[in-house]
Amino acid sequence: MKDAYNNLYNDFFYHRHNGFWKDCAMRKLPALLDSTRMLACGEDLGMIPACVPEVMRELRILSLEIQRMPKSPEKTFDDPATYPYLSVCATGTHDTSTLRGWWEEDRQMSERFFHETLHCEGQAP
């Protein structure tokens, strides 16, 4: 019975709605994009519908890349050199602490970043 509910849940939230999200995006976003000369950036972070990368590619909406929030669950930090050409790289979002706040709030994590990503030796400042 539990598997049946899980299957229903997964189908409803991750498959059935994917087409709905894409149809709505392709109907609404072009008008918004055509109304300005500004570059659009999508906050494609966290759990997003599977159609989001495809829609963003088709509409040439820039991806948002945050080094301390890699899109791959296997990574702790991302490498900006690997980001897509059509992307914006930032140190955080409105949902995260400031760069300084992040650096100070978890010394273990900032030490890891200092050594593994910045390739620096000694104690992190």
Task: Identify the function of each model-found stretch.
Residues 1-125:
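Catalytic cores of glycan-processing enzymes that make or break glycosidic bonds
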